Amino acid sequence: MSTYLIGDIQGCDSALDRLLQHIDFSPSRDTLYLLGDLINRGPASADVLRRCMEYGDAVKPLLGNHDLHLLASAHGVRKPGRRDTLQSILDAPDRQDLLKWVAQQPLARCLENPQGQQLLMVHAGVLPQWSLKDVMALAQEVHDHIRSEGLPEFLQHMYGNTPNQWHATLTGHDRLRVIVNALTRIRFCTPGGAMDFESAESAEAAPVGLVPWFECPDRQTRDVMVAFGHWSTLGLINRPNLMALDTGCVWGGCLSAMEIGHDFTERQLHQVHCDQAQQPG
């Protein structure tokens, strides 16, 4: 039995198929944790979702910004953009099954091994003020709204860059928006946790006054192992307490799977090269 963490697939089903063949994946034996952005920008978003659904409990995804954008598009809150490739889902005969499955997925997952080590998985990142317990509770808040009858209203208010900083006193749509933006969009922030949404460059090109979210000096999750995707220009990171696994599949990079052992520090990287589906920019 093997456990794999897989970075952003973004609708590249052929690359996912080749990766699963490469690792000899068996849904009866292995488990895949998908770090969000399963769909969009690539050519076969509906096929990715169908494949994941077919594998049942062997696939454990979490939601990224593109997955939430699908729900917003499906509910008429946002029209698909010029570069979106969501139509294969929106026009699918099994559209409702696909959308229902997406809406059931969480925004964060946590694994704990027999030694008590914890591995937090999110799509983009976390704010420095949040402990692991905070992350899981706040992700659940959003998850509860996504699974409720209030989903359309939640989606209408989900978009926006403000507030850009967490305060425990936040309520309503502002509170939910900050949580969503941190878990699915953050790259850079100030050392105090004010999020920036303008720059998507590499960590070395951090704008003045900003740091990658994981470099915040007082980050409460610094002693927790964190795995994330979302940031293709960051490239692969494999540190004892940090794994970044978006390696730019949709842009012609690689699709990456990190195989992890029982103590989470035993790791083996598996990659397949991807055909370029879109040009960056």
Predicted features along the sequence, with ranges:
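Active-site environment of divalent metal-dependent phosphoester hydrolases
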Residues: C12-S14, N40-G42, H66-A72, Q129, ...
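N-terminal active-site segment of His-dependent metallophosphoesterases
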Residues: M1-Y55, L68
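Active-site neighborhood of divalent metal-dependent phosphoester bond hydrolases
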Residues: A46-L49, M53-D174
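Residue-level marker for buried hydrophobic side chains located in beta-strands
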Residues: L5, L34, P61-L62, L120, ...
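Short active-site oxyanion
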Residues: S2-Y4, D57-K60, R222-M225
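Active-site-proximal beta-strand elements of phosphoester/diester hydrolases
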Residues: S2-Q10, L119-G125, A244-L245
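Divalent metal-coordination and catalytic microenvironments
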Residues: D8, D37, G64-N65, V102, ...
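Acidic, His/Gly-rich catalytic cores of divalent-metal-dependent hydrolytic chemistry
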Residues: M136-G281
